[in-house]
């Protein structure tokens, strides 16, 4: 089939429209199963509008099918109008790879095929450089500052004028010529891999000669805010769930939390003047280094197109397989409501920090497993390990609950900014992802980290009022012993990424840990105050974390001098959430999770092991109490009691060497 298509397209007289159609056919055969294509065709044709011989979708049809708000003024400070933003994106991506010549495209079936591939995780099959190329396409689809004004593709407009794609239409001014020669501005090879087999390189290059000012255009903050609000709300969405459920059950509290997360993320793209919008360099830098999974919710959203309610292919005779529709219904029956985040295991304490918006925010950047890093897609569950509101504000309680947890965890700290100019509403939320267990200085040897797996590296972050993310250093295994990832002491408090001073005869371990490297966090022994430190990494001091992946310290803005910021926090609440890796996968229902199931089925999971540790500690405490009660009745009894204590290692030489 491929050879035949290639033969048909030889010569450079083939039009971009014809090449775009052939490329859509290639995408369809390479990226979809026959069953998925059948469902997609049924969904498209059942709702398509028609003008002459052209069948197409407009913004109203697309928004209604996807279940996204289109002009809804109840979900934000202004109109929560995600519909036009999504439609602008698909109109641009539907013209791929001839955005300059054909964009904005009419949303035909061929355009829809390309849109689904590029907006879901199927893009890796057609883009040579994967995620990097996709970021360029996403930026171009969102850029609306400096873009030539185009008539909106509303149903009324399409009915009044012929649906026609002119062969050499000017397209978006976002794709006009530019003399930019920077390496990261050159995307001539963006889709050469997809076109090489079609023998159409010259056609593509002709279109791409003037496809450079995509990097001079900008994304308005208003447009990006509407998209972010959508992504935060539907982050847990799966292809078998109704998108409308995530909006219908929103209350004022959840909306407020979602707006807070959106504002924090927007601030990380803010270079000082929001009226200028977001340029390509900032967009690419922040997405690549700080929010790599932010667009993942689009996969589930657009995979709705691959499930048709009208088809039930299992009705065939002798068919022993379930249809896609039956599978969707089966999952829907097992799915919890969006107001009850399924990621939190039953039996956990009531969270004060962690809510749906925070979970969505974490899913945008926190790698918790491999090969699927997104915490909302890889079957990860969260178990409440410690809450200062529930378990008390003491290191004794913290030690009892946290040091007995022997699996990865996330610590969240929220409080007030402790500086003279701070107002009552100036709150901050910071945290860290710790892929290994918490260890006190007396526990064994240092942990070894698999630096080839991002989910095995620690991560330090700030969630609000500005999104900041500091990934663990690849050289973490070569750090000195006084630079542990996490340290716990009843006298010096909790330290993450800090340098631990050596104990002295007078102070023992009461010396305060000091900041090191590009990021650290310290919590005092009373759990009342914390310090969050981040720097641009130019101090030449080794540390656990890399510099923040923010536009503030991007390559174009880097300073020649070391810069650091110390944020002092008056703590309101501390929460520690355990990471429970389950055996469920995105294709299975994760909602039937049993606490007895883990990634390694031959050992109990972390919750059971922690409960076993607590039971052991209780038995040991009771045994010691009985020994002490029995000692002192006579010489023989005293000797027997002493012998038992020595055997237990509580007294004697063995105790001194522990």
Curated annotation (Swiss-Prot):
Signal peptide: none annotated. The keyword Cytoplasm applies. Residues 318-337, 499-518 are annotated as: Disordered. Residues 352-580 form the TLDc domain. Residues 318-333 have a biased composition (Basic and acidic residues). One of its GO terms (cellular component) is cytoplasm. Its main location: cytoplasm. Keywords: Cytoplasm. It is found in: Cytoplasm. InterPro entries: TLDc_dom. Coiled coil: none annotated. May be involved in a process influencing telomere capping. Belongs to the RTC5 family. This is Restriction of telomere capping protein 5. It comes from Arthroderma gypseum (strain ATCC MYA-4604 / CBS 118893).
């Amino acid at each position: 089939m491929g050879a035949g298509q290639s033969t048909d397209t030889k010569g450079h007289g083939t039009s971009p429209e014809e090449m775009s159609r052939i490329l859509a056919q290639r995408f369809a055969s390479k990226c979809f199963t026959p069953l998925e294509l059948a469902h997609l065709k049924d969904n498209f044709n059942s709702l398509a509008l028609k003008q002459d011989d052209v069948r197409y979708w407009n913004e109203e049809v697309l928004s209604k099918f996807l279940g996204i708000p289109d002009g809804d003024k109840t979900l934000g400070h202004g109109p929560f109008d995600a519909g036009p933003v999504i439609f602008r994106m698909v109109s641009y991506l539907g013209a791929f790879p001839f955005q300059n010549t054909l964009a904005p495209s009419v949303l035909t079936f061929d355009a829809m095929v390309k849109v689904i591939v590029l907006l879901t995780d199927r893009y890796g099959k057609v883009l040579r450089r994967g995620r990097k190329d996709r970021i360029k396409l996403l930026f171009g689809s969102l850029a609306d500052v400096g873009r030539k004004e185009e008539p909106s593709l509303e149903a009324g407009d399409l009915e009044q004028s012929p649906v026609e794609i002119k062969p050499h239409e000017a397209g978006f001014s976002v794709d006009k010529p530019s003399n930019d020669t920077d390496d990261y501005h050159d995307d001539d090879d963006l889709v050469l891999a997809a076109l090489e087999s079609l023998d159409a390189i010259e056609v593509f290059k002709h279109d791409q000669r003037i496809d450079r000012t995509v990097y001079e255009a900008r994304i308005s903050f208003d447009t990006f805010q509407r998209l972010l609000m959508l992504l935060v709300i539907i982050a847990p969405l799966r292809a078998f769930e109704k998108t409308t459920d995530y909006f219908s059950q929103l209350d004022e509290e959840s909306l407020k939390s979602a707006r807070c997360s959106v504002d924090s993320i927007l601030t990380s793209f803010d270079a000082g003047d929001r009226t200028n919008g977001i340029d390509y360099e900032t967009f690419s830098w922040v997405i690549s280094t700080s929010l790599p999974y932010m667009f993942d919710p689009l996969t589930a959203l657009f995979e709705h197109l691959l499930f048709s309610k009208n088809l039930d292919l299992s009705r065939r005779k002798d068919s022993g397989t379930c249809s896609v529709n039956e599978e969707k219904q089966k999952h829907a029956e097992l799915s919890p409501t969006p107001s009850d985040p399924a990621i939190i295991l039953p039996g956990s304490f009531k969270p004060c920090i962690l809510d749906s918006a925070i979970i969505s925010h974490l899913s945008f950047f926190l790698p918790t497993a491999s090969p699927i890093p997104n915490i909302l897609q890889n079957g990860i569950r969260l178990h409440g390990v410690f809450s200062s509101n529930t378990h008390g504000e003491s290191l004794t309680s913290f030690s009892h609950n946290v040091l007995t947890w022997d699996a990865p965890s996330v610590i969240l700290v929220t409080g007030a900014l402790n500086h003279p100019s701070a107002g009552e509403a100036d709150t901050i939320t910071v945290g860290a992802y710790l892929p290994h267990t918490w260890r006190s200085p007396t526990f064994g040897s240092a942990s070894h980290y698999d630096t080839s797996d991002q989910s095995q590296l620690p991560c330090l972050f700030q969630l609000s009022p500005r999104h900041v993310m500091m990934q663990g250093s690849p050289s973490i295994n070569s750090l000195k012993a006084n630079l542990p990832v996490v340290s716990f002491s009843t006298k010096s408090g909790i330290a993450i990424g800090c340098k631990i001073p050596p104990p002295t005869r007078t102070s023992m371990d009461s010396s305060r840990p000091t900041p090191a490297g590009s990021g650290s966090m310290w919590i005092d022994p009373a759990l009342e105050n914390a310090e969050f430190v981040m720097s641009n990494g130019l101090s030449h001091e080794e540390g656990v974390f890399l510099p923040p992946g923010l536009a503030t310290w991007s390559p174009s803005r880097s300073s020649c001098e070391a810069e650091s910021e110390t944020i002092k926090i008056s703590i309101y609440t501390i929460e520690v959430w355990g990471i429970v890796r389950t055996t469920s996968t995105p294709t299975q229902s994760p909602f039937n999770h049993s606490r007895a199931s883990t990634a390694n089925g031959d050992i109990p999971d972390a919750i059971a092991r922690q409960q076993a540790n607590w039971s052991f500690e209780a038995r040991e405490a009771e045994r010691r109490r009985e020994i002490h009660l029995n000692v002192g009745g006579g010489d023989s009894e005293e000797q027997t009691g002493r012998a038992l204590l020595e055997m237990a290692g509580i007294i004697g030489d063995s105790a001194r060497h522990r």
